[in-house]
């Protein structure tokens, strides 16, 4: 979806940092180490982060130099330093391919979009 990149380039102009994402559809549960549910976050405020993640180069470079906390992505690094990050609309088909199951899903999306 070329619109994702265009939305990202527009969003990054607001604060120098922007991440694609989609509103979550699932109910998310917080769970203790013992497996007990400890909370249910408000789904209306939860988005699943995707790529692209777009940053002004100098801002990202500085974050990599200053961040000392463990983080899962560059956006979290900027968040940990107190810098705002803008979320922009991605697409549910824009999945992260990490496992063989993900690859099967991605292949289905590609076949459906190209009418194979």
Residue ranges and their predicted role:
Residues 1-33, 50:
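Conserved beta-loop-beta/alpha segment of the NTase-like Rossmann-fold superfamily
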Residues 9-10, 38-39, 77, 86-87:
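Short secondary-structure boundary/capping segments
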Residues 47-116:
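Conserved alpha/beta core of the MobA/IspD/sugar-nucleotide pyrophosphorylase nucleotidyltransferase superfamily
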Residues 7, 34-40, 104-106:
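Short, hinge-like loop/turn segments at secondary-structure boundaries
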Residues 20-22, 40, 88:
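Generic beta-sheet signal
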Residues 1-4, 37-41, 96:
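Short, charge-rich amphipathic segments
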Residues 29-55:
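Short, flexible, basic/aromatic active-site loop/helix in glycosyltransferases
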């Amino acid at each position: 979806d070329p619109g994702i990149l265009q939305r990202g380039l527009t969003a990054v102009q607001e604060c120098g940092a922007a991440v694609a994402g989609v509103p979550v559809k699932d109910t998310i549960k917080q769970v203790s180490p013992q497996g007990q549910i400890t909370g249910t976050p408000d789904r209306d405020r939860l988005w699943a982060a995707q790529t692209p993640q777009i940053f002004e180069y100098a801002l990202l470079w500085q974050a990599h130099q200053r961040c000392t906390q463990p983080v899962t992505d560059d956006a979290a690094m900027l968040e940990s330093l107190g810098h705002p990050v803008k979320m922009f609309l991605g697409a549910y088909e824009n999945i992260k391919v990490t496992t063989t199951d993900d690859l099967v899903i991605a292949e289905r999306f590609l076949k459906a979009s190209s009418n194979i």
